[in-house]
Every structure is written in C-alpha cells, then in structure tokens.
Amino acid sequence: MAPSADMTSLPLGVKVEDSAFGKPAGGGSGQAPGAAAATAAAMGADEEGAKPKVSPSLLPFSVEALMADHRKPGAKESSLAASESAQAAGGLAQPLGVPPGSLGAPDAPSSPRPLGHFSVGGLLKLPEDALVKAESPEKPERTPWMQSPRFSPPPARRLSPPACTLRKHKTNRKPRTPFTTAQLLALERKFRQKQYLSIAERAEFSSSLSLTETQVKIWFQNRRAKAKRLQEAELEKLKMAAKPMLPPAAFGLSFPLGGPAAVAAAAGASLYGASGPFQRAALPVAPVGLYTAHVGYSMYHLT
C-alpha cells in the first residue's frame, strides 16, 4: 500500500516545500505536491524492498533458518512441532537437554520442558529410589527405552544336548565267534607247536575243529599279536631289573687317592701354606701306589 501525501509531511509544521524531499534537484524553491507524494511513495517502496523477506518454505534446520533474525510466530510453532515429532520418532534429530526451539530461533525464549532421564538436571532431580537399583526381583527398575521392543534382549536359546561320541561299529560287522573250551585248547596247543600255518595245514586243522579257515586265520593273527605284547613286557621288566639303583661313580671319587693329582695338591698346599703369615698344617700325603684303583662302590666295604 503506497503512503498518502498527508503521511509524508514532516512534524513540527515543516512544509513539504522546505524539506529535502520537496526541493528540486537543480536548487529550485518549489515543487508540486503530486511530485512530492510520488517521491515519498518511491522511497517507501525502496525501504520495503530493502527489508529481508523470509521464505515460508525454509526448513527449520536449514542454514537460512538458523541465520535469519526475524521469524514469524507461525514458523516458530511449526519448527517446534517438527522438532518434537522428530525427537519422538527417532530421538536423534536433536541433542539431549537442548530446547526444541533453540536451534530454529536462537534469540527466541525457550519454553520450559520436562527434564529427560539422561540430562544433567534430570539426573540431579531424580529421587534416590530411582538411582538405587531395586533389591527385590519382583519390581525391577526399567527405564522407558529398556521397555521398548527394539532394546529388549533376545530370548535365550536352549542348548542342544551334545552328540554321542561313542565309537560306531560297522553295520556289516560279523558277530564274534564263540569258541568252545576244546577248540581253544587245541588252538593253543597248535600255536605252541607252530605259529604260522600253511594253507594246507590251516585247511586240515580247521576241518578237524569244525571251524572255517578264516576263523582259524584270524585267531592265529590275534594270538601272534598277544604273544608279541607279552614278549615286549618281559623285556621291559628285564631292563628295569638290570639297571642299578645308583648310577656308577655317583658318590665315589673318580681319581686315585695316591695318584699324581693328590701329590700335586699336597705339594701346592705345603708351598703356599709356608709362605703366608698364617701357616697351616699340610695334609698328610699318602704314599704313591696306595689306593691306586678308582674308589667306587668298594669304598662302602672299607673297615
């Protein structure tokens, strides 16, 4: 709306002709009232164009909305509703403890809002019953985010019983042959005579015992393996019995008492003992040839 001619008049009774707007550009003293009104209308239009225009389509979190100094009341309410809806939906659109309208309009006074559980004020104002964990299992303390199905722990899976680790036999395994006492005695007697049977001897011996050749063959194989194990056990026992209880020369001297080593040791002791300020009695030297043999286990039999 363009201003009228009465609105453009200056206060204190100053006429339009005497003001700067009424003077012509060439220094003339008079100007028509219509021209003055047109000039004032043009300047009013320029002032309105110079004012920043806020686009109604700005987002509440855009750079233009944050940098704008003047916001409309409707825009503030819309930004507040948008921020609250975003916080209720995801909880990540706005930092904790920050009022919803502070991001959209920095100079707008923020309305008081209830303190959250994780804000500083909320932690300070929580009662002691909420801070201390409930001891009774009937009423466990659970926060709202823990009650959400998104944060609920998955149900515990039941562990399946371990598989059986027993050895599985072949399905086509033949049953064990039940030998009679007479058959076992005959097989043992034949094994002591000869451990390896030829094909003809095995066929004749198996027919005499009413057994198959395969049964006689397998029995001889098992009997030879058993005899080998018994023989190895007997050899191990003989080796253990042959070993002495004490290792040789463990406690005996490995050098002769009357040898050159004893003579040299006695000579050195007498040499250094006589030269020192404190003389010590030299050890008696055994005559050469006495106890020339190495002293081993025989030293225990000396009387």
From Swiss-Prot:
Biased composition (Low complexity): 32-44, 77-101
Crosslinked positions (Glycyl lysine isopeptide (Lys-Gly) (interchain with G-Cter in SUMO)): K15, K133
GO biological process terms, semicolon-separated: activation of meiosis; anterior/posterior pattern specification; BMP signaling pathway; bone morphogenesis; cartilage morphogenesis; cell morphogenesis; cell surface receptor signaling pathway involved in heart development; embryonic forelimb morphogenesis
Gene Ontology annotations for the cellular component aspect, listed alphabetically: nuclear periphery; nucleoplasm; transcription regulator complex
InterPro entries attached to this UniProt entry: HD, HD_metazoa, Homeobox_CS, Homeodomain-like_sf, Msh_Homeobox_Regulators
Predominant cellular place of this UniProt entry's protein: nucleus
Biased segments, Basic and acidic residues type: 133-142
Name the UniProt record assigns to this protein: Homeobox protein MSX-1
Organism: Callithrix jacchus (White-tufted-ear marmoset)
Lineage of origin: Eukaryota, Metazoa, Chordata, Craniata, Vertebrata
The encoding gene: MSX1
